[in-house]
Protein backbone atom coordinates (compact mmCIF):
# COMPACT_ATOMS: atom_id res chain seq x y z
CA UNK A 1 0.00 0.00 0.00
CA UNK A 2 2.73 2.49 0.99
CA UNK A 3 4.68 1.69 -2.16
CA UNK A 4 1.62 2.33 -4.33
CA UNK A 5 0.88 5.65 -2.63
CA UNK A 6 4.52 6.66 -3.01
CA UNK A 7 4.44 5.95 -6.77
CA UNK A 8 1.24 7.97 -7.19
CA UNK A 9 2.69 10.91 -5.25
CA UNK A 10 5.90 10.85 -7.30
CA UNK A 11 3.82 10.92 -10.49
CA UNK A 12 1.77 13.80 -9.07
CA UNK A 13 4.81 15.88 -8.15
CA UNK A 14 6.28 15.35 -11.62
CA UNK A 15 2.98 16.30 -13.20
CA UNK A 16 2.47 19.55 -11.30
CA UNK A 17 5.88 20.88 -12.18
CA UNK A 18 8.84 19.85 -10.07
CA UNK A 19 12.09 19.60 -12.00
CA UNK A 20 12.69 21.34 -15.31
CA UNK A 21 10.73 24.51 -16.04
CA UNK A 22 11.02 26.80 -19.04
CA UNK A 23 13.14 29.85 -18.23
CA UNK A 24 12.82 32.60 -20.89
CA UNK A 25 16.30 34.03 -20.28
CA UNK A 26 18.29 30.81 -19.99
CA UNK A 27 16.52 28.48 -22.43
CA UNK A 28 16.74 28.40 -26.20
CA UNK A 29 13.73 26.91 -28.01
CA UNK A 30 14.03 24.70 -31.09
CA UNK A 31 10.74 24.48 -33.01
CA UNK A 32 10.33 21.90 -35.74
CA UNK A 33 7.67 23.33 -38.04
CA UNK A 34 7.75 26.90 -36.76
CA UNK A 35 6.58 28.71 -39.88
CA UNK A 36 4.67 26.33 -42.18
CA UNK A 37 1.49 26.35 -40.07
CA UNK A 38 -0.43 28.85 -37.96
CA UNK A 39 0.53 27.42 -34.58
CA UNK A 40 4.23 27.36 -35.42
CA UNK A 41 4.15 31.03 -36.41
CA UNK A 42 2.33 31.96 -33.21
CA UNK A 43 4.79 29.97 -31.09
CA UNK A 44 7.78 31.74 -32.65
CA UNK A 45 6.21 35.15 -32.10
CA UNK A 46 5.08 34.35 -28.54
CA UNK A 47 8.54 33.22 -27.43
CA UNK A 48 10.28 36.15 -29.11
CA UNK A 49 7.85 39.02 -28.57
CA UNK A 50 6.42 38.11 -25.16
CA UNK A 51 9.38 36.36 -23.51
CA UNK A 52 12.43 37.61 -25.46
CA UNK A 53 13.59 34.02 -25.79
CA UNK A 54 16.00 32.78 -28.44
CA UNK A 55 14.22 30.65 -31.05
CA UNK A 56 15.61 28.29 -33.68
CA UNK A 57 13.06 27.37 -36.34
CA UNK A 58 13.57 24.42 -38.71
CA UNK A 59 11.07 24.38 -41.55
CA UNK A 60 10.59 24.29 -45.31
CA UNK A 61 9.69 27.99 -45.53
CA UNK A 62 10.39 31.04 -43.40
CA UNK A 63 7.03 32.81 -43.22
CA UNK A 64 8.17 34.60 -40.06
CA UNK A 65 9.92 36.93 -42.53
CA UNK A 66 8.37 40.38 -42.36
CA UNK A 67 6.61 39.65 -39.06
CA UNK A 68 7.26 41.66 -35.90
CA UNK A 69 9.34 38.79 -34.57
CA UNK A 70 12.03 39.47 -37.14
CA UNK A 71 12.78 42.83 -35.51
CA UNK A 72 14.80 40.89 -32.98
CA UNK A 73 17.33 39.30 -35.32
CA UNK A 74 19.50 38.17 -32.41
CA UNK A 75 16.63 36.12 -31.03
CA UNK A 76 15.55 34.33 -34.22
CA UNK A 77 17.45 31.78 -36.31
CA UNK A 78 15.96 29.98 -39.30
CA UNK A 79 17.30 26.66 -40.58
CA UNK A 80 15.95 25.50 -43.91
CA UNK A 81 14.89 21.90 -44.48
CA UNK A 82 13.69 21.70 -48.07
CA UNK A 83 12.01 18.32 -47.63
CA UNK A 84 11.31 16.63 -44.27
CA UNK A 85 10.69 13.35 -46.06
CA UNK A 86 14.27 13.34 -47.39
CA UNK A 87 16.74 12.02 -44.80
CA UNK A 88 19.63 13.79 -46.56
CA UNK A 89 17.87 17.15 -46.15
CA UNK A 90 17.28 16.37 -42.48
CA UNK A 91 20.94 15.50 -41.99
CA UNK A 92 22.02 18.80 -43.57
CA UNK A 93 19.69 20.72 -41.24
CA UNK A 94 20.95 18.82 -38.20
CA UNK A 95 24.56 19.50 -39.15
CA UNK A 96 23.77 23.21 -39.45
CA UNK A 97 22.07 23.08 -36.04
CA UNK A 98 25.05 21.34 -34.48
CA UNK A 99 27.41 24.05 -35.73
CA UNK A 100 25.41 26.96 -34.32
CA UNK A 101 26.83 28.94 -31.41
CA UNK A 102 23.44 28.86 -29.69
CA UNK A 103 22.25 25.46 -28.50
CA UNK A 104 18.61 24.54 -27.81
CA UNK A 105 17.40 23.25 -24.46
CA UNK A 106 13.70 23.03 -25.35
CA UNK A 107 12.55 20.97 -28.35
CA UNK A 108 9.01 21.45 -29.68
CA UNK A 109 7.95 19.04 -32.42
CA UNK A 110 5.18 20.87 -34.28
CA UNK A 111 4.91 19.05 -37.61
CA UNK A 112 1.32 19.39 -38.88
CA UNK A 113 1.50 18.09 -42.44
CA UNK A 114 -1.99 17.20 -43.67
CA UNK A 115 -3.89 18.81 -40.80
CA UNK A 116 -6.19 20.54 -43.29
CA UNK A 117 -7.58 17.12 -44.26
CA UNK A 118 -9.25 16.87 -40.84
CA UNK A 119 -11.49 19.80 -41.80
CA UNK A 120 -13.20 17.80 -44.56
CA UNK A 121 -16.60 16.21 -43.93
CA UNK A 122 -15.44 12.99 -45.52
CA UNK A 123 -12.01 11.44 -45.96
CA UNK A 124 -10.34 12.47 -49.21
CA UNK A 125 -8.72 9.06 -49.64
CA UNK A 126 -11.39 6.38 -49.22
CA UNK A 127 -9.43 3.90 -51.31
CA UNK A 128 -5.80 2.90 -50.96
CA UNK A 129 -4.77 3.77 -54.51
CA UNK A 130 -1.35 5.05 -55.54
CA UNK A 131 -2.22 8.69 -54.85
CA UNK A 132 -3.47 7.82 -51.38
CA UNK A 133 -0.40 5.75 -50.53
CA UNK A 134 1.97 8.49 -51.74
CA UNK A 135 0.14 11.07 -49.64
CA UNK A 136 0.18 8.76 -46.62
CA UNK A 137 3.92 8.15 -47.00
CA UNK A 138 4.64 11.88 -47.20
CA UNK A 139 2.55 12.71 -44.13
CA UNK A 140 4.11 9.93 -42.05
CA UNK A 141 7.63 10.93 -43.12
CA UNK A 142 6.96 14.57 -42.22
CA UNK A 143 5.00 14.16 -39.00
CA UNK A 144 6.59 11.03 -37.56
CA UNK A 145 9.88 9.99 -39.17
CA UNK A 146 11.43 13.47 -39.08
CA UNK A 147 10.33 13.97 -35.46
CA UNK A 148 11.91 10.68 -34.39
CA UNK A 149 15.20 11.43 -36.17
CA UNK A 150 15.47 15.01 -34.89
CA UNK A 151 14.57 14.03 -31.32
CA UNK A 152 17.14 11.22 -31.31
CA UNK A 153 19.75 13.59 -32.74
CA UNK A 154 19.09 16.14 -30.00
CA UNK A 155 19.34 13.50 -27.29
CA UNK A 156 22.58 12.09 -28.70
CA UNK A 157 24.40 15.16 -30.03
CA UNK A 158 22.83 18.44 -28.91
CA UNK A 159 21.66 18.07 -25.31
CA UNK A 160 24.90 16.44 -24.08
CA UNK A 161 26.80 19.39 -25.54
CA UNK A 162 24.65 21.81 -23.55
CA UNK A 163 25.03 19.69 -20.45
CA UNK A 164 28.81 19.99 -20.69
CA UNK A 165 28.98 23.71 -21.51
CA UNK A 166 25.96 25.35 -19.87
CA UNK A 167 25.75 26.92 -16.47
CA UNK A 168 23.76 25.23 -13.72
CA UNK A 169 20.68 27.39 -14.35
CA UNK A 170 20.44 26.24 -17.95
CA UNK A 171 20.77 22.53 -17.22
CA UNK A 172 17.70 20.43 -17.83
CA UNK A 173 15.78 19.92 -21.05
CA UNK A 174 12.24 19.79 -22.37
CA UNK A 175 10.85 17.68 -25.22
CA UNK A 176 7.34 18.64 -26.34
CA UNK A 177 5.43 16.61 -28.92
CA UNK A 178 2.27 18.13 -30.36
CA UNK A 179 -0.46 15.63 -31.22
CA UNK A 180 -4.24 15.90 -31.70
CA UNK A 181 -7.33 14.93 -29.70
CA UNK A 182 -8.53 13.31 -32.93
CA UNK A 183 -6.19 10.41 -32.11
CA UNK A 184 -8.32 9.69 -29.05
CA UNK A 185 -11.69 9.25 -30.78
CA UNK A 186 -13.16 7.94 -34.06
CA UNK A 187 -13.00 10.40 -36.95
CA UNK A 188 -14.36 10.25 -40.51
CA UNK A 189 -11.73 12.44 -42.15
CA UNK A 190 -8.01 13.10 -42.03
CA UNK A 191 -7.10 9.47 -41.40
CA UNK A 192 -3.58 9.83 -42.84
CA UNK A 193 -2.86 12.80 -40.55
CA UNK A 194 -4.45 11.11 -37.54
CA UNK A 195 -2.49 7.90 -38.12
CA UNK A 196 0.77 9.87 -38.15
CA UNK A 197 -0.22 11.52 -34.87
CA UNK A 198 -1.08 8.14 -33.34
CA UNK A 199 2.50 7.27 -34.19
CA UNK A 200 3.63 10.40 -32.33
CA UNK A 201 1.64 9.29 -29.29
CA UNK A 202 3.42 5.93 -29.29
CA UNK A 203 6.82 7.50 -29.90
CA UNK A 204 6.26 9.94 -27.04
CA UNK A 205 5.40 7.12 -24.65
CA UNK A 206 8.45 5.19 -25.80
CA UNK A 207 10.92 8.05 -25.49
CA UNK A 208 9.51 8.99 -22.07
CA UNK A 209 9.99 5.43 -20.82
CA UNK A 210 13.44 5.27 -22.38
CA UNK A 211 14.54 8.46 -20.63
CA UNK A 212 13.36 7.09 -17.29
CA UNK A 213 15.24 3.83 -17.69
CA UNK A 214 18.35 5.07 -19.46
CA UNK A 215 21.45 5.59 -17.33
CA UNK A 216 22.03 9.20 -18.32
CA UNK A 217 23.01 12.45 -16.64
CA UNK A 218 20.53 14.31 -18.85
CA UNK A 219 17.55 15.72 -17.00
CA UNK A 220 14.86 15.62 -19.71
CA UNK A 221 11.20 16.33 -19.04
CA UNK A 222 8.62 15.30 -21.65
CA UNK A 223 5.19 16.69 -22.44
CA UNK A 224 2.68 15.69 -25.09
CA UNK A 225 0.22 18.45 -26.00
CA UNK A 226 -3.01 17.55 -27.79
CA UNK A 227 -4.46 20.07 -30.22
CA UNK A 228 -8.26 20.44 -30.11
CA UNK A 229 -10.35 19.62 -33.17
CA UNK A 230 -10.93 22.49 -35.59
CA UNK A 231 -14.09 23.34 -37.54
CA UNK A 232 -12.40 25.33 -40.31
CA UNK A 233 -9.17 27.02 -41.34
CA UNK A 234 -10.51 30.26 -39.86
CA UNK A 235 -11.15 28.45 -36.56
CA UNK A 236 -7.58 27.03 -36.60
CA UNK A 237 -6.17 30.50 -37.27
CA UNK A 238 -8.33 32.11 -34.59
CA UNK A 239 -7.39 29.61 -31.87
CA UNK A 240 -3.66 29.45 -32.63
CA UNK A 241 -2.67 32.53 -30.55
CA UNK A 242 -4.40 31.26 -27.39
CA UNK A 243 -3.16 27.69 -27.97
CA UNK A 244 0.38 29.03 -28.27
CA UNK A 245 0.08 30.97 -25.02
CA UNK A 246 -1.43 27.94 -23.26
CA UNK A 247 1.47 25.74 -24.32
CA UNK A 248 4.09 28.25 -23.21
CA UNK A 249 2.29 28.63 -19.89
CA UNK A 250 2.51 24.84 -19.41
CA UNK A 251 6.27 25.02 -19.96
CA UNK A 252 6.62 27.89 -17.51
CA UNK A 253 4.80 25.78 -14.92
CA UNK A 254 7.00 22.79 -15.69
CA UNK A 255 4.10 20.59 -16.75
CA UNK A 256 4.87 16.91 -17.31
CA UNK A 257 2.91 14.11 -18.95
CA UNK A 258 0.15 15.48 -21.15
CA UNK A 259 -2.17 18.41 -21.64
CA UNK A 260 -5.10 19.13 -23.91
CA UNK A 261 -4.59 22.62 -25.31
CA UNK A 262 -7.57 24.97 -24.92
CA UNK A 263 -8.85 22.75 -22.09
CA UNK A 264 -8.55 22.94 -18.31
CA UNK A 265 -8.24 19.17 -18.06
CA UNK A 266 -5.72 16.72 -19.37
CA UNK A 267 -5.64 13.00 -19.91
CA UNK A 268 -3.16 12.88 -17.05
CA UNK A 269 -5.72 14.38 -14.66
CA UNK A 270 -8.12 11.54 -15.31
CA UNK A 271 -5.51 8.78 -15.34
CA UNK A 272 -3.92 10.02 -12.12
CA UNK A 273 -7.22 10.08 -10.24
CA UNK A 274 -8.27 6.72 -11.68
CA UNK A 275 -4.91 5.17 -10.83
CA UNK A 276 -5.05 6.51 -7.30
CA UNK A 277 -8.57 5.17 -6.73
CA UNK A 278 -7.81 1.77 -8.25
CA UNK A 279 -4.86 1.33 -5.88
CA UNK A 280 -7.35 1.03 -3.03
CA UNK A 281 -9.61 -1.52 -4.74
From Swiss-Prot:
GO annotation terms (biological process): deoxyribonucleoside triphosphate metabolic process
Cellular component GO terms held in the UniProt record: mitochondrion
Induction: Expression is induced by the KAR4 transcription factor.
Catalytic residues, chain numbering: 197
Keywords: NADP
UniProt keyword NADP, yes or no: yes
Binding site for NADP(+): 39, 60, 67, 152, 197
Lineage: superkingdom: Eukaryota
Family the entry assigns: Belongs to the short-chain dehydrogenases/reductases (SDR) family.
Purpose of the protein: May be involved in the regulation of dNTP production. Induces the SOS system when expressed in E.coli, therefore, it may play a role in DNA metabolism and/or in genome stability.
Designated name of the protein: Oxidoreductase-like protein SRL4
Organism from which the protein derives: Saccharomyces cerevisiae (strain ATCC 204508 / S288c)
Amino acid sequence: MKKTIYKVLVSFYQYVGLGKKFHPSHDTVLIIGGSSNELGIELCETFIEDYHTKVINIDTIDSINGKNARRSEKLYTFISCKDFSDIKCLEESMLYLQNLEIIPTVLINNMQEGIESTLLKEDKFLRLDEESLNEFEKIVRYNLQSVILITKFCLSNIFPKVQAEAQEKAKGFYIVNISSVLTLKPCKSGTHFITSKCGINSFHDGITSELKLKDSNLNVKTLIAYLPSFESEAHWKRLSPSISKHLVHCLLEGRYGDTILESKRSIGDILLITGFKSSFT
